Every structure is written in structure tokens, then in C-alpha cells.
Curated annotation (Swiss-Prot):
Binding site for Mn(2+): 148, 150, 219
Job of this protein: Catalyzes the NADPH-dependent rearrangement and reduction of 1-deoxy-D-xylulose-5-phosphate (DXP) to 2-C-methyl-D-erythritol 4-phosphate (MEP).
Residues given in the record as 1-deoxy-D-xylulose 5-phosphate binding sites: 123, 149-150, 174, 197, 210, 215-216, 219
Name of this protein: 1-deoxy-D-xylulose 5-phosphate reductoisomerase
Family: Belongs to the DXR family.
Biological or metabolic pathway of the protein: Isoprenoid biosynthesis; isopentenyl diphosphate biosynthesis via DXP pathway; isopentenyl diphosphate from 1-deoxy-D-xylulose 5-phosphate: step 1/6
Top-level EC class as recorded in UniProt: oxidoreductase
Gene for this chain: dxr
Cofactor(s) demanded: Mg(2+); Mn(2+)
Residue numbers binding NADPH: 10-13, 36, 122, 124, 203
Length: 382
């Protein structure tokens, strides 16, 4: 029996994780849950899974949750300290890190320091503080298992092979809803259009990131830290069908890929059950029915966010943290209809240009950079 804490339990990844747990009550048990927005949904999860402790966004949410609780009454915490408490609970074997954005960094670090294995869906943790997290993972001898479908695919495609035999890793991207949209038409993109992803059902922030290709850029940086790959050995190819989740090319010219239906329950189930496998509940792949798989190069002129991510990775230091923080502010502004679609990448680039990078050592230094970038990005809002 593997005991889990889920950070971000009411979000897209959290809900999919709980669906996998429902299918395998004999393999997984829920010890802790943390969420930030939907107290009513958390109350229902508490009733069903009976965790020992939970955390919510703030004191007001904690009070509201107490009023909604039924017969089962777990310990209730709140804030980032509360999420960190859930991440480090005694008796937890694995923490599913699925809080959206840089807010997931502190509780993920707390989990690692407490010796918990990590199923990582929060890519921002590695984008912001990849060097720190990698060092802590090695120091505390925990497993860092990717939940993103692309990184899970690479993880599986690397299994059993020597690192020195890898020529490059290739991340696939759906291309988002605007793959065929002209640069001129992108100026008129609406929020509603950007929120309609052609393949995946996800939360609002990551859906916008997928539309700008910033999500793929963040995944490039995440892949660098997960697999110890330099930027020049990480490629991106657009694959609209989202069936091949990513690939590894070896020095002999052979390419190993992982295929599957576009359903996050598959990489989640793999991370939860690793090194074994378990049923995920997804539809089995029918290649004859799919018939055609296509590929094309990403257009970094129309989608400069991907270029900015590569630039940040190559520059190193605190640039990836600045990229991420500025993007979070810009996407939030777009979701509030304060800026246009193309303004997202423009705000990120201006913030990066205003930054002088350095190499942080401690967590608080990374968080200070994150705060600086957010404050600076806000100065570029209309």
C-alpha cells in the first residue's frame, strides 16, 4: 500500500490522480490533500477518501471547510505553510505535486526534505529552482518521477539505456489551437478561442500556456533538469494528434517513443505505481483507427514564448525563474482580459530584459527573484 499526499487535489491533475486511486484502493491510500480554490470540492474528497489532514488557501477557507465537513474531520491547515505540512506528513510515501505555478515550489521542497518521493506535475518547481531541487533530491535520496505526459514518455524511453548513448530528446507539442493561425490573426485572438485546446482537457493557466507554446518552453527547461540534458540536445516537434508523447533519439540513429491516448491518467498511474504498472482507465490505442501521425517544426516567430524559454535555459542562473514569474503575471492578466494574446510573450521578454541574473543557492533567494519578476512584470501592464 502506497500512502499519498496530493497537492492541488481539486485541480485537473488532482482529480485525475484521485480517479486512478479509486481504481486501486488496494494499492493506494490518501493521507493528505491540499487545494487552493474549491473548498466544496475538497469537502467531498474528504468524505470519500478520509485523509488525516488537509490544507486550504487561507484562514477564511479553513473556516468555511470546517462548516462543510461531515462525520470525518481531518486536521485542517491553510496557506503555503499548510501545504508544506501536508507535503511532509508522517506516513506519506509519495507526494503528488500538482499545485499550479511557482506556489508549488515551497511545499515540494518540504516534501523532498522530509524524504518523500515526488510525482511531479508542477513543472514550475524545476523551472524556477531546478539546481536547488536536483541537489536536494540527491541529498535526500528520493525519486523524482515526472507526471507531465512528455517527460513521462522520455523517462520510459530512457529506461534501460546508458546516458552516453543518447543523441537528443524530442518533446512533442500539439501546436495548440492556433497552429495554423497567421501572425496577423493572432493579434485578434480572444480568451474564449485560447481556452479551446484541440486535444487535452486542462486548467485555464496551462491551456493558455499551451496556446502560446510557453508550456512547451517550460517543459524544455524541466527536461533539462530531469534528464541532465543541455539545451542543444533538447528538441521540439509539433505533433497535432498528441499520440506520440515524446521521443529519445540514440547515437545509432534509432528513436524510441512512447505512444498513448491523450489522457493524463496514464502518466499519473505510471508515476504512482513505478517501477510497476497499473490500469489507468484510459482508452486503449487503436493505431489503425488513427491512421495518420504528422509532424512539423514549431514556428518560433509566431510563438516567441518557446524561443524565450530556450533563451532563458541557455542564459541560466535566475533567467528561467524570471521567465516563469513574468509569464504567470501575463497569463493572469490575459485571463482577466487586461492584455491581448500577443502581449503575453511581449511582457515576458521585457521582464527578462530588465533582469540581471545571478546564481541562487537557498530557497529564499529563488523566491525573492520570483517576487521581483512578478512586481516588474506588473509595471508593463496597461
Amino acid at each position: 500500500m502506497r500512502a499519498l499526499s496530493i497537492l492541488g487535489s481539486t485541480g485537473s491533475i488532482g482529480l485525475s490522480t484521485l480517479d486512478v486511486v479509486r481504481q486501486h484502493r488496494d494499492r493506494f491510500t490518501i493521507v493528505g490533500l491540499a487545494e487552493g480554490h474549491d473548498v466544496a470540492a475538497l469537502a467531498a474528497q474528504i468524505e470519500e477518501f478520509k485523509p488525516l489532514a488537509v490544507s486550504v488557501r487561507d484562514a477564511e477557507s479553513a473556516k468555511k471547510l470546517q462548516e462543510l465537513l461531515g462525520a470525518h474531520k481531518p486536521e485542517v491547515y491553510y496557506g503555503l505553510d499548510g501545504a508544506a505540512t501536508i507535503a511532509a506528513l508522517d506516513g506519506v510515501d509519495m507526494v503528488v505535486s500538482a499545485i499550479v505555478g511557482a506556489a508549488g515550489l515551497r511545499p515540494t521542497v518540504a516534501a523532498i526534505k522530509a524524504g518523500k518521493h515526488i510525482a511531479l506535475a508542477n513543472k514550475e518547481t524545476l523551472v524556477v529552482a531546478g539546481e536547488l531541487v536536483s541537489r536536494l533530491v540527491a541529498e535526500h535520496k528520493v525519486h523524482l518521477l515526472p507526471v507531465d505526459s512528455e517527460h513521462s514518455a522520455i523517462f520510459q524511453s530512457l529506461a534501460g539505456h546508458r546516458a552516453e548513448d543518447v543523441e537528443r530528446i524530442i518533446l512533442t507539442a500539439s501546436g495548440g489551437p492556433f497552429r495554423k493561425t497567421s501572425a496577423e490573426e493572432l493579434k485578434q485572438v480572444t480568451l474564449e478561442q485560447a481556452l479551446k485546446h484541440p486535444q487535452w482537457s486542462m486548467g485555464a493557466k496551462i491551456t493558455i500556456d499551451s496556446a502560446t507554446l510557453m508550456n512547451k518552453g517550460l517543459e524544455v527547461i524541466e527536461a533539462h533538469w530531469l534528464f541532465n540534458m543541455p539545451a542543444e540536445k533538447i528538441g521540439v516537434v509539433v505533433h497535432p494528434q498528441s499520440i506520440i508523447h515524446s521521443m529519445v533519439e540514440y547515437i545509432d540513429g534509432c528513436v524510441i517513443a512512447q505512444l498513448g491516448a491523450p489522457d493524463m491518467r496514464a502518466p499519473i498511474a505510471y508515476a504512482l505505481s513505478w517501477p510497476e504498472r497499473c490500469e489507468s482507465g484510459i482508452h486503449k490505442l487503436d493505431l489503425a483507427k488513427i491512421a495518420t501521425l504528422t509532424f512539423e517544426e514549431p514556428d518560433m516567430e509566431r510563438f516567441p514564448a518557446l524561443r524565450l524559454a530556450f533563451d532563458a535555459l541557455k542564459a541560466g542562473g535566475t533567467y528561467p525563474a524570471v521567465l516563469n514569474a513574468a509569464n504567470e503575471i501575463a497569463v493572469a492578466a490575459f485571463l482577466e482580459r487586461k492584455i491581448g494574446f500577443l502581449d503575453i510573450a511581449a511582457m515576458v521578454e521585457k521582464t527578462m530584459q530588465a533582469h540581471e541574473a545571478f546564481t541562487p543557492v537557498e530557497l529564499e533567494e529563488y523566491l525573492q527573484v520570483d517576487r521581483w519578476a512578478r512586481d516588474t512584470a506588473k509595471t508593463f501592464l496597461p
